[in-house]
Structures are given as structure tokens and as C-alpha cells.
Amino acid sequence: YQTSSPGSNITIGPL
């Protein structure tokens, strides 16, 4: 699961 935020990139969960 991948989420993108303004100014930051964060990856959550198994790839």
C-alpha cells in the first residue's frame, strides 16, 4: 500500500 502526501512520500505495508 502506497500513499503520497504533499511534500512527502511514504510507503506503508509490505512491498
From Swiss-Prot:
One of the GO BP terms on file: proteolysis
Keyword flag Hydrolase = yes
The answer on whether this UniProt entry bears the keyword Ribonucleoprotein reads no
Tissues where the protein occurs: Expressed in placenta, specifically the fetal cotyledonary tissue (FCT) (at protein level).
**Where in or outside the cell is it found?**
Secreted, Extracellular space
Q: What is this protein called?
A: Pregnancy-associated glycoprotein 56B
Q: Which GO terms describe its molecular function?
A: aspartic-type endopeptidase activity
